[in-house]
Amino acid sequence: MTIQKQKALIGYKKAQSLLKKIITMVEEDRYCIDIMQQNLAAIGLLKSAHQLLFEGHLNSCFKSALETNSPAKKQKMIDEILTVTKMATK
């Protein structure tokens, strides 16, 4: 596992723990602003993990694909990056 994936995994586990806390807060009918703050913290963790995976992918899989002689493989990687980027900016 790459260092980026290891760091992303830590972020995902932290987000998972935070989501459990948020669910408990909602079930306990806690103050809305407190819940929203925790929600934003979870979103931040997920965005950071996404960025780590994206950077790792560009520096490994994407880079390798661009170094091949296969135009189809190159185009497939470009299309995948465009798809993920569009999803991330929605």
Model-inferred region functions:
Residues 1-90:
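Solvent-exposed interaction patches of small proteins and small membrane subunits
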